[in-house]
């Protein structure tokens, strides 16, 4: 069982330059849309040095909030990656988190959103809430990236020109 360190070190946010570069590189390597990984990081809310205790006694570690129950499997693939690395090396956390997401998507036969839900939980109710919140944040990221609200645009009738109407003319 994983027991986090007892210290007075406060978790610190990951600098924008670090998470931008590391997520971009890792997502490109694993062939995952970087916006999905950025959204996952945003949704998880982790920081360098974060240890979040779960109801089942496990911990979510570091910026990508990788669950401590996954440490043995991670060690099989990345022998030098320990909980300390995941907690305190932001870039390593992003690479391992992106790899973990990639594995979850592959396990779900390419279903991205099922893979994202699996990244967070196996509990159906928790998964449903998580993926709902994830999709809202993902849509906002896409809107910002594209400079428009894609979903809103698709669901609204096309604007029509009704002629030039002048209001508030002096009498």
Model regions and ranges:
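Catalytic glycan-binding domains that act on GlcNAc-containing polysaccharides
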Residues: 2-165, 170
């Amino acid at each position: 069982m994983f027991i986090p360190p007892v210290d007075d070190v406060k978790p610190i946010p990951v600098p924008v330059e670090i998470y931008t570069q590391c997520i971009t590189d890792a997502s490109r390597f694993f062939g995952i849309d970087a916006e999905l990984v950025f959204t996952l990081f945003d949704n998880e809310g982790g920081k360098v040095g974060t240890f979040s205790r779960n109801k089942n006694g496990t911990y979510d570690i570091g910026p990508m909030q990788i669950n401590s129950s996954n440490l043995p499997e991670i060690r099989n693939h990345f022998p030098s990656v320990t909980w300390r690395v995941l907690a305190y090396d932001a870039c390593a956390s992003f690479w391992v988190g992106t790899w973990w997401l990639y594995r979850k998507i592959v396990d779900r036969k390419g279903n991205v959103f099922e893979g994202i839900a699996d990244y967070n939980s196996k509990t159906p109710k928790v998964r449903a809430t998580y993926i709902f919140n994830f999709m809202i944040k993902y849509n906002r990221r896409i809107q910002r990236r594209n400079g428009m609200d894609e979903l809103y645009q698709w669901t609204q009738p096309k604007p029509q020109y009704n002629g030039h109407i002048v209001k508030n003319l002096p009498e």
